[in-house]
């Protein structure tokens, strides 16, 4: 997410009324309401609290909406759903790990997310956060291995698919990188930086095939 998109989303969150309580069935109905964009915005936002992994397909569809607020809320809600394990201790550790990442305490964060993975190997976001840290440490093979685990558990994880692309760029495999970026964009076409990188790679590969570079 770019800085501009983050500011836009923050403004939308401030303007939109917060849901009083989580009602998944109601929120899904709102998201699917083709007669009211306000209802779809409300549903897209509220599913961040009430939604489950089973609601991801509905949110993926909403990522392709014409209304920018619906798209932004849907993306945020997907991340919120992904970040809930259903295990209070894992969720506590997850918050600790995110704080460690923010503080750039890489080794401590790796250990925290490794603890999460050992306790709840089915929790895809534990693998994703560790993959991110490994990437930042330059441990690309380990990061790739964790990305495999993420996508195996959550095939809609556009963040992990984008991560694959970033890793393969570092490994000097632009064609493979582009393939993963395009897979991420097929799920979430709102990833501006990913789209810009994909455009650069397409031009690079065209020039390479023509023998001009």
Regions found by a protein language model. Name each.
Residues 21-32, 52-62, 87-94:
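Amphipathic alpha-helical scaffolding segments comprising HEAT/armadillo-like alpha-solenoid repeats
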Residues 37, 90, 124-125, 158-159, ...:
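Helix-start (N-cap) detector for alpha-helical repeat units in TPR-like alpha-solenoids
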Residues 49, 80-84, 102, 136, ...:
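Register position in tetratricopeptide repeats
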Residues 99, 178-213:
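Terminal, low-structured helical/coil segments at or just beyond the last alpha-helical repeat
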């Amino acid at each position: 997410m770019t800085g501009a998109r983050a500011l836009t989303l923050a403004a939308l969150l401030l303007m939109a009324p917060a849901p009083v309580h989580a009602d998944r069935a109601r929120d899904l109905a709102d998201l699917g309401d083709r007669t009211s964009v306000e209802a779809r915005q409300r549903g897209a936002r509220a599913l961040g609290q009430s939604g489950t992994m089973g609601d991801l397909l509905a949110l993926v569809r909403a990522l392709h909406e014409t209304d920018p607020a619906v798209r932004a809320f849907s993306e945020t809600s997907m991340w919120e759903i992904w970040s809930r394990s259903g295990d209070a201790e894992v969720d506590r550790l997850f918050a600790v790990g995110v704080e460690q990442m923010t503080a750039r305490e890489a080794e401590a964060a790796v250990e925290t997310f490794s603890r999460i993975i050992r306790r709840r190997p089915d929790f895809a976001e534990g693998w994703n956060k560790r993959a991110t840290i490994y990437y930042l440490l330059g441990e690309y093979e380990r990061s790739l291995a964790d990305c495999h685990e993420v996508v195996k558990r959550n095939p809609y994880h556009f963040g992990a698919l984008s991560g694959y692309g970033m890793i393969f760029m570092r490994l000097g495999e632009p064609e493979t990188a582009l393939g993963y970026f395009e897979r991420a964009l097929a799920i979430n076409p709102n990833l501006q930086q990913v789209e810009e990188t994909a455009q650069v790679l397409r031009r690079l590969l065209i020039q390479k095939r023509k023998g001009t570079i």
